UniProtKB/Swiss-Prot annotation:
Originating organism: Aromatoleum aromaticum (strain DSM 19018 / LMG 30748 / EbN1)
Keyword Acyltransferase tagged: yes
This protein's name: 2,3,4,5-tetrahydropyridine-2,6-dicarboxylate N-succinyltransferase
Binding site for substrate: 104, 141
Matching HAMAP family: DapD
Amino acid sequence: MQDLQKIIDDAFENRANLSPSAAPAAVRDAVASVIAGLDAGRLRVAEKIDGNWTVNQWIKKAVLISFRLADNEVMAGGTNQYFDKVPTKFGDYTPEQFREGGFRVVPPAVARRGSFIGRNVVLMPSYVNIGAYVDEGTMVDTWATVGSCAQIGKNVHLSGGVGIGGVLEPVQAGPVIIEDNVFVGARSEVVEGVIIEENAVLSMGVYIGQSTKIYDRATGEVTYGRVPSGAVVVPGSLPSADGKYSLYCAVIVKRVDAQTRAKTGINELLRGA
């Protein structure tokens, strides 16, 4: 792994000189190995170690380099054709591979090669980008998007139209992380490497980036970039210092209780392949 990382780091420093027709075989092989590892879930752009999230920047670099090494090619998809550098994850899947994967893919859902889909995941007509990790039992509902390298935990519900930001453009230091058992309400957006800790609930229409104020009404505290475990968050606003206008914020209104769980719990009947 150390050798692989060194090849990727060196290639990234030399990325301006890489192209589909000009790249050393060692670089091609290293990038292909990383993409295959991401696709199978053996590698992750970010992982939780001793309770803290660590970003593997070299893996993210490999994803970026992969775009320099590939030409666009035509891809068939139902009645349509596509033209891109990254193949789809399921383009050459056999029925046996789908059964072995243990997930469901509802047309016209798309996942790119280099993303990982765990067992009992349901992909409604949605989009999962390269480098993303979607863990077991998660529902990605209709028109939801999981951005490049985003990390989605177990038993998460991403409601219709949810946007989970990626890291490739604009380039972000770390991916968005949605931990286990999180519920994200319809049309909400989480971007710019924000972390939503386990068991949190975001209501419909909550938008959180690194500069979004997260106001806890119980304590009056304002934080940024992380929603604490078990928080229930709704959209709100805070007044300006001069009282002349208000600006958007996310408001922690309470902690998850039995009533909240009854409204946001997953339906086991919908899981399983």
